[in-house]
Design a protein with these regions (language model features):
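Alpha-helical scaffold domains
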Residues: 1-122
Length: 122
């Protein structure tokens, strides 16, 4: 579903709601899927992996979120850069100190778009 006929609005809804819910309920079995998606050649799977925890708030696996952002920091693809910033911005509403620390440590590797989006609420 994510790859076939995909566009950002379709992918974002599935990632944040369906995939995100599955990740919460089946974290151990979904983790390998997300690990595969973050390195997938398809940009929509990579975007879905980044956005999969968008609504998790205090249940966010920050280690996974930050790892995925690091692994895709080199991306030139707009939709991935935007997803990184959005995911970090949303998590900053729950744990601003963690996101600020991540940006201090890794911010130079991120695109300007990702950094700006991530820092909007800091």
């Amino acid at each position: 579903m994510i790859v076939e006929g995909a566009w950002w609005d379709f992918v974002d809804d599935i990632a944040a709601n369906l995939v995100g819910a599955l990740l919460l309920d089946y974290r151990e079995s979904m983790r390998p899927v997300m690990e595969a998606w973050i390195d997938d050649p398809d940009r929509w799977r990579r975007r879905a992996a980044i956005l999969s925890q968008l609504r998790h708030k205090e249940r966010t696996d920050a280690e996974m979120l930050f790892d995925f952002c690091r692994r895709r920091a080199h991306e030139t693809e707009f939709f991935i850069r935007k997803a990184i910033g959005w995911a970090l911005r949303e998590y900053s509403k729950t744990d601003p100190e963690a996101v600020a620390a991540f940006l201090r440590a890794e911010g130079d590797a991120l695109s300007g778009l990702s950094r700006r989006e991530a820092a909007k609420h800091l």
